């Protein structure tokens, strides 16, 4: 019986990465409320979000031999969590706090299959070179900053701000492909 992978996400970057990896998938729309719990650690939060997205998607997909993938990304710097910017000044605050500094991108993935949950969190350290106010203005004008955790996309024009990374490029983009492949193997997605 044919196995199906469903992506419980509206992220164009996650779709692009699955296509790049050659993994056939369908989309399922299953949004969840992304609110932290009292005293929840950033790692626990990002992992819980991926699991909730996968479970929500799994509950909307009928049939057997179904694997549903959920994922979430946050950025952590100096104990603060950075999600998507709410407006231009929020994006400015985020990018200027990364300017000339290191921050950590945490991307979680969860796969739900017949009640079993497989999950992982990938952490990548990203080092930015200093960014000027005029560079921020130019970057903001591209529109890239608006829908991304930390107000930047590594695969876009913000790549010129990144001095180096320690970890997974695809995780910074939104979906750690090595960890995804590992979980798909653990969950017997590839088995005949």
UniProtKB/Swiss-Prot annotation:
SUPFAM superfamilies: ITPase-like. Pfam families: Maf. It catalyses: dTTP + H2O = dTMP + diphosphate + H(+); UTP + H2O = UMP + diphosphate + H(+). Its EC number is 3.6.1.9. The keyword Hydrolase applies. The record marks 13, 73, 155 as: Important for substrate specificity. Its cofactor is a divalent metal cation. Its main location: cytoplasm. The active site is at 72 (proton acceptor). Keywords: Cytoplasm, Hydrolase, Nucleotide metabolism. It is found in: Cytoplasm. GO terms for cellular component: cytoplasm. One of its GO terms (molecular function) is UTP diphosphatase activity. GO terms for biological process: nucleotide metabolic process. InterPro entries: ITPase-like_fam, Maf-like. Belongs to the Maf family. YhdE subfamily. Nucleoside triphosphate pyrophosphatase that hydrolyzes dTTP and UTP. May have a dual role in cell division arrest and in preventing the incorporation of modified nucleotides into cellular nucleic acids. HAMAP family: Maf. This is dTTP/UTP pyrophosphatase. It comes from Hydrogenovibrio crunogenus (strain DSM 25203 / XCL-2) (Thiomicrospira crunogena). The lineage of its organism: Bacteria, Pseudomonadati, Pseudomonadota, Gammaproteobacteria, Thiotrichales.
